[in-house]
Amino acid sequence: MNFWYHLCWWLCRVGLFFWHPVFRVTGRDRVPAGSCIFCANHSGMAGPIWILLALPEKKMIRIMAKQELRRVPFVGWVMEKFRVIFVNRGAHDIAAYQQCIDALEQEHDKMLVFIEGTRCNRDKHVRAKTGGDVVGVT
């Protein structure tokens, strides 16, 4: 278990209680016990946090994120502590795909993939990128 992940998870849970006390999630009982991939829309900066807090897992959930975020001060450091899998979106990043497959098959982790590949306005329809589907069928 990752100390930083759990510390941040609990701090966010407490913050969420005060910031948005009515937080209702349905369907937690349908999340499989083993490894799986969650595909989500990315409509805002807090989206990944909301999703992680909504899931019933206490175990760290692996996230795929664009490679450029690794260079953002502090954010990149936090993401590395959370074992984020960074993806070069401009190429077929075989190493990132292999990390995802290993996380699912060997470590039995759950993964969170923002299938549109970027943040999008809720009113704007964006086609899903390829990549998340490749990991899912491998």
Question: Residue ranges of each PLM-predicted region?
Answer:
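Soluble catalytic domains of membrane acyltransferases
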Residues: 17-138
